[in-house]
């Protein structure tokens, strides 16, 4: 099955941005239609999310996996929809509201690469290819790389300073943790 051109272009653009190549922005569509279509990235990243679920917190012997799957899937959808809503007034405060759609388009497609990178690092750790002493460090470095990637995207798409980009990354992190902790409390 062939990947639709707009998806392939967006993922290629996200890859180029991960390499800190601003030219990656040229591969993203713009406008309201592209904004709504960028949420297809949530469906593409969902299998990686599902693979990461058993690695999260939980009591292995008594876990009701159907309940966990339902709660975590709802949390996943909330995460994909809450961040754009929270960031809209932030872009307004920063005087960059006109770039909000473009930012969310790029942010959404970048999530596919982020899930893939975290999944790959965890796979290497679980496979035993990395010495035990490095396993936690690899994951820590992967998360730092994800934060830097998101900051780079915020900086170049919204044309803002590094501190403002860092604030957006922090908002994303705090919102994500809030949603995760809430979901975990409902298992």
Q: What are the roles of these predicted feature ranges?
A:
Residues 2-104:
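Selected alpha-helical membrane-embedding segments in polytopic membrane proteins
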Residues 37-40, 105-117, 171, 175:
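Alpha-helical transmembrane segments of multi-pass membrane proteins
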Residues 72, 76, 102-110, 139-140, ...:
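Alpha-helical transmembrane segments of multi-pass membrane proteins, especially transporters
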Residues 77, 81, 85, 111, ...:
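Residue-level signal for the membrane-embedded core of alpha-helical transmembrane segments
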Residues 82-83, 109-127, 185-187:
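C-terminal halves and exits of single transmembrane alpha-helices
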Residues 124-187:
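Terminal transmembrane helical module of multi-pass membrane proteins
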